[in-house]
């Protein structure tokens, strides 16, 4: 998707879960991006493989005591750990700590009894899929010699607090994109960001509905 934004011609790419489901898929996606060297790319990425479904199980185990939420989360962690170990020969790569921190925060939430609505908890947990996948792809792209910036979409795509079906605040989002995204393209050619999620003014995470990654790509093209 090609569009013109604030004097910058850029392409928006969207990679779904199947496109980054394992190390081989990530390598293929990165090879595609490397083919556009010198062009401005905004890359929207979904959670890896069936991670969204797996994280939904974590939420249900936690909220309805259907199973052990920590065990279910560990399965998600192990899946991503295997992908990272296949992509990065050096275990000192910062991506390992960054991804681990996301899981640690989730474990902390699971340690407490539910204090919020199901939809709120859903968004805080299920959104990890996109945050983690983009960290991994961004780090691998950097390792392959393609400088890029990992953008936390929650800082620029502002929504209301209708959890699981959040509505975009177009005025705020456009202002933040102008302020934060456009200047980045003066430093690098590639921005990696998340589909499916947004943020509230209270710094909570929201999701945009089950096919939200496609929606995110369209939002950036519109803005």
Model-derived segments and spans:
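Nucleotide/pyrophosphate-binding catalytic subdomain
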Residues: 3-223
């Amino acid at each position: 998707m090609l569009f013109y934004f604030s004097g910058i011609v850029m392409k928006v790419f969207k990679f779904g879960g199947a496109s980054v489901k394992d190390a081989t898929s990530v390598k293929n996606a990165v090879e595609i991006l490397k083919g556009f060297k010198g062009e401005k790319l905004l890359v929207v990425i979904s959670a890896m493989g069936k991670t969204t479904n797996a994280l939904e199980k974590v939420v249900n185990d936690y909220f309805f005591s259907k199973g052990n939420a920590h065990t279910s989360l560990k399965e998600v962690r192990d899946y991503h750990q295997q992908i990272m170990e296949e992509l990065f020969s050096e275990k000192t790569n910062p991506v390992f700590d960054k991804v681990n921190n996301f899981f640690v925060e989730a474990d902390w939430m699971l340690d407490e009894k539910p204090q919020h609505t199901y939809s709120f908890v859903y968004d805080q947990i299920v959104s990890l899929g996109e945050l983690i996948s983009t960290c991994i792809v961004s780090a691998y792209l950097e390792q392959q010699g393609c400088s890029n910036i990992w953008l936390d979409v929650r800082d620029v795509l502002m929504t209301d607090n209708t959890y699981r079906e959040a509505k975009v605040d177009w005025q705020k989002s456009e202002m933040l994109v102008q302020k934060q995204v456009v200047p980045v393209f003066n430093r690098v050619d590639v921005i990696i960001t998340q589909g499916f999620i947004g943020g509230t003014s209270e710094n909570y995470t929201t999701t945009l509905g089950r096919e939200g990654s496609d929606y995110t790509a369209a939002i950036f093209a519109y803005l």
